[in-house]
């Protein structure tokens, strides 16, 4: 879609919805993910939807703790809650399913006017099988663990368990069947299949059945998809044969679970990945083997076509590495979703870069109100008794979401049209540029509100960022925090930027822009200075002189 047409399309897309509005009890189309020229959108109630979410802590999805999960959405200005569904609870007795907790979460989500993404903690949770029911854990002959290269049993499920696969398929299918009837409002917009599947403590399974298959030939569809010559796993993949074989075993297992659920209710399904270092990946064994890490993305796509996307869980705070992960998972055939990221303050500003790279959703982990903190990655203030309430503890994320949530639908529609750019402050580079057809947007960090004779020094901490939407060839929607935004014409070095109008305002529920004041004078003479907090949105019209 051309930028000039975007404003018209935006109004049509948003006539009936605000970004966090929960649907009424009427028929709504099933959420889906659409692709337009390799730009993606999650469609909810027939319109593009940007997921500004958070994930509950692993043990928070119990009724006694609902009051510490769903109220966090309002504090954060989030429109989506991610929460686990525990196989061990759903099927405590084999063949008998209890979805009362799921129903309770749906009711809570509707009451708090948010959508949900459910996480099926089935065969895998972080490489282990700790959420399988007790009747599975107690029968290890029928439901075996993986055996590693030293012949030792490790705390990771073997894919060579037809009984466990069958049980997982039935359990996940039962969940999706229940959602089909229990959620006509489409409160649930996506479902994650398993959680960070892979192997810790080994490279691949060495059980006799696995050894037999490893000695066999690589499946033809994988060879063809990767453009390789046929042969055994060792012949085709060499030093990476063990890890690639394990990835195929896991991916084909997950595909059968996903397909069983999708046959019941075709919501968008995805898997999440525990990452290896995107710049210095190391050897297999230093990261979760067989997982949907960057080198295995194409394999998982081939093996598991029932999945809508493969998503990275990003717990790497360094700017260069964070952006490298986004580059690895943002593909022409893989929508970008960040379903987990760290909850330390440094992670908050990455929402700007994620949206600018076309993400359909962003969700920090563990931002409920239980005061639990995964200290290696998390906000220590979660458990700090001196913190002044949940608003203080969640403030870095709430600050950015407060700006973005009112325009979440607009951003989603603009991203589908390819008209969004965004960036997050890099502590090593205090200026950044964003490219549009006729203009370059110039971002500077650490400048005062007045004057252009000072060199940008960066913010401390580096928490700035901006998102810019092209509304036309010379018109932009600008939002951000702790950043100065200016524009440079691209095709005539003799020309300089001139602001025709800088309007501060907001969109109403129908997508119509409402101006509250016009910026000029000190507010525009040195570019557009956006504070470290606040919800200022600017509609900017440009020309040259």
Where are these regions (language model features)?
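Aromatic- and carboxylate-lined catalytic core of secreted/periplasmic carbohydrate-active enzymes
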Residues: 352-489
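Catalytic-core region of carbohydrate-active enzymes that cleave or remodel glycosidic bonds
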Residues: 114, 256-267, 295-400
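N-terminal carbohydrate-binding accessory modules
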Residues: 21-79
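Aromatic-lined substrate-binding rim segments of carbohydrate-active enzymes
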Residues: 65-140, 250-266
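Polysaccharide-binding and catalytic clefts of secreted carbohydrate-active enzymes
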Residues: 142-299
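C-terminal beta-sandwich/jelly-roll accessory domains of carbohydrate-active enzymes
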Residues: 441, 445-466, 474-545
């Amino acid at each position: 879609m051309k930028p000039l047409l975007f404003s018209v399309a935006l109004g049509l897309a948003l006539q009936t919805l605000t970004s966090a509005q929960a649907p009424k009890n009427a028929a709504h189309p099933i959420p889906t993910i659409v692709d337009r020229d390799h730009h993606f959108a999650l469609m909810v109630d027939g319109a593009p939807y940007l997921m500004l979410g958070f994930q509950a802590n692993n043990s928070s999805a119990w009724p006694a703790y609902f009051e510490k999960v769903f109220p966090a959405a309002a504090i954060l200005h989030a429109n989506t809650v991610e929460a686990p569904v525990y196989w061990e609870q759903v099927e405590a007795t084999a063949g008998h399913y209890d979805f009362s907790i799921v129903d309770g979460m749906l009711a809570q989500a509707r009451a708090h006017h948010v959508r949900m993404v459910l996480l099926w903690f089935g065969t895998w949770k972080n490489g282990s099988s700790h959420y399988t029911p007790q009747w599975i854990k107690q029968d290890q002959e029928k439901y075996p663990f993986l055996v590693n290269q030293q012949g030792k049993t490790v705390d990771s499920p073997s894919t060579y368990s037809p009984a466990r696969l069958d049980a997982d398929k039935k359990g996940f299918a039962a969940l999706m069947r229940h959602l089909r009837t229990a959620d006509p409002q489409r409160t649930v917009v996506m479902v994650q299949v398993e959680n960070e599947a892979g192997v810790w403590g080994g490279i691949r399974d060495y059980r006799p059945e696995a050894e037999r298959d490893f000695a066999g030939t690589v499946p033809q569809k994988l060879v063809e998809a990767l453009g390789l010559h046929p042969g055994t796993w060792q012949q085709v993949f060499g030093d990476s044969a063990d890890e690639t074989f394990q990835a195929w075993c896991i991916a084909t297992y997950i595909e059968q679970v996903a397909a069983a659920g999708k046959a019941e209710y075709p919501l968008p399904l995805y898997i999440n990945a525990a990452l290896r270092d995107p710049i210095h990946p190391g050897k297999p064994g230093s990261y979760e083997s067989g997982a949907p890490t960057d080198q295995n993305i194409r394999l998982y796509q081939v093996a598991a076509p029932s999945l809508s996307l493969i998503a990275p869980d990003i717990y790497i705070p360094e700017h260069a590495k964070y952006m490298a992960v986004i580059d690895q998972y943002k593909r022409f055939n893989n929508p970008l979703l960040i379903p987990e990221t760290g909850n330390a303050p440094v992670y908050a500003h990455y929402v700007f870069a994620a949206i600018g790279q076309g993400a359909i959703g962003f969700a920090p982990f563990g931002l409920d109100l239980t005061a639990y903190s995964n200290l290696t990655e998390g906000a220590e203030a979660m458990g700090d008794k001196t913190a002044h309430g949940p608003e203080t503890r969640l403030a870095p994320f709430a600050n950015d979401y407060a700006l973005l949530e009112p325009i979440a639908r607009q951003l989603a529609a603009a991203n589908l049209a390819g008209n969004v750019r965004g960036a997050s402050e890099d502590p090593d580079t205090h200026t950044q540029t964003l490219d549009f057809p006729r203009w370059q947007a110039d971002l500077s960090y650490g400048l005062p509100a007045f004057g252009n004779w000072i060199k940008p020094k960066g913010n401390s901490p580096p928490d700035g960022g901006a998102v810019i939407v092209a509304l036309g060839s010379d018109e932009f929607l600008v939002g951000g925090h702790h950043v100065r935004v200016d524009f440079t014409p691209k095709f005539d070095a003799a020309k300089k930027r001139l602001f025709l109008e800088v309007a501060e305002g907001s969109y109403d529920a129908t997508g119509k822009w409402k101006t509250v004041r016009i910026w000029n004078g000190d507010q525009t003479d040195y570019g557009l200075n956006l504070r470290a907090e606040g919800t200022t949105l600017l509609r900017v019209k440009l020309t040259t002189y």
